[in-house]
Amino acid sequence: MDKKSRVLIVGGTGYIGKRIVNASISLGHPTYVLFRPEVVSNIDKVQMLLYFKQLGAKLIEASLDDHQRLVDALKQVDVVISALAGGVLSHHILEQLKLVEAIKEAGNIKRFLPSEFGMDPDIMEHALQPGSITFIDKRKVRRAIEAASIPYTYVSSNMFAGYFAGSLAQLDGHMMPPRDKVLIYGDGNVKGIWVDEDDVGTYTIKSIDDPQTLNKTMYIRPPMNILSQKEVIQIWERLSEQNLDKIYISSQDFLADMKDKSYEEKIVRCHLYQIFFRGDLYNFEIGPNAIEATKLYPEVKYVTMDSYLERYV
């Protein structure tokens, strides 16, 4: 049996990072979790780190601003996965450029997976502002990786189920299904791709030692989870035995309503526009420099949205 790579996860206490840490440990990889010195003041993150340690992970304290300490950490591992936050309220994507410099100096890293886990930034050059900032910064990191000739895999995992399926993709900030009415974008029939976060972790770790994913983008497109917003709503209505009042909003009204929103709200709405009006998750064919995860790893029994939504009933 081939020896499994030693994996360092940066951002391992975050929303998707903790799933990647769990998957790495579960799949038998020697797992290292990098944490920033200031994390010790956050009781929730400290408890999570101690939990990872109990499972067998090794904890490494280092700041991305401490170049030498970062290089020393990298020399202990084979693969680096970054799960640094790239969301609206906490956006640290360009911090990864420090990680790229450290990987270059360390010289031993066999694979780097930067923080992506959403839409493919290289096909989002048309994205609306200010939502485009996410994709602009991710492209900068990609180009730095490639310029440094660092072996990579980019993971495009589409919509996190917890944020999108759990809320039926509503704008109200609630992460539970609505009980009376639901907002539908356009006619509600544009296809999207909804993915369980634990499955994102599993597919990500599966890819790190696979030569088929080397220097490629890996899309996670579970066939049974390629669904429109309306189809996800119908699943929820069937499970909950409750019919929701449907409120439809046109693309014109949706965009017009953005004008008076905060910067953060505009970013969220831009991304929703790309997904549910333009269909940017599924309106393209996977090219020769990319590969699809469920075809690569058919042994993974991914969570369907029917199954996922049962927890909310």
Curated annotation (Swiss-Prot):
Q: Which residues bind NADP(+)?
A: 11-17, 36, 45, 142
Task: Detail which positions bind substrate.
Answer: 271
| UniProt-listed SUPFAM superfamilies | NAD(P)-binding Rossmann-fold domains
The alphabetical list of record keywords is: NADP, Oxidoreductase
Q: What reaction gets catalysed by this protein?
A: (+)-lariciresinol + NADP(+) = (+)-pinoresinol + NADPH + H(+); (-)-lariciresinol + NADP(+) = (-)-pinoresinol + NADPH + H(+); (+)-secoisolariciresinol + NADP(+) = (-)-lariciresinol + NADPH + H(+)
Q: Which residues form the active site?
A: 138 (proton acceptor)
Major enzyme class: oxidoreductase
GO BP terms in the entry: (+)-lariciresinol biosynthetic process; (+)-pinoresinol catabolic process; (+)-secoisolariciresinol biosynthetic process; (-)-lariciresinol biosynthetic process; (-)-lariciresinol catabolic process; (-)-pinoresinol catabolic process; lignan biosynthetic process
EC number(s) recorded for this UniProt protein: 1.23.1.1, 1.23.1.4, 1.23.1.3
Q: Has keyword NADP?
A: yes
* Disulfide bond entries: none
Q: Which GO terms describe its molecular function?
A: lariciresinol reductase activity; pinoresinol reductase activity
Subunit (UniProt) = Dimer.
Its family remark reads: Belongs to the NmrA-type oxidoreductase family. Isoflavone reductase subfamily.
Please explain the role this protein plays, according to its UniProt record. Answer: Reductase involved in lignan biosynthesis. Catalyzes the enantioselective sequential conversion of (-)-pinoresinol into (-)-lariciresinol and of (-)-lariciresinol into (+)-secoisolariciresinol. Can also convert with a lower efficiency (+)-pinoresinol into (+)-lariciresinol, but not (+)-lariciresinol into (-)-secoisolariciresinol. Abstracts the 4R-hydride from the NADPH cofactor during catalysis.
- In the UniProt entry for this protein, what further remark is given in the free-text comments? Phe-164, Val-268 and Leu-272 are involved in enantiospecific binding of (-)-pinoresinol while in PLR_Tp2, a 'Gly-268' and a symmetric substitution between Phe and Leu favor binding of the (+)-antipode of pinoresinol.
The protein depicted here goes by the name Bifunctional pinoresinol-lariciresinol reductase 1
- Species name for this entry? Thuja plicata (Western red-cedar)
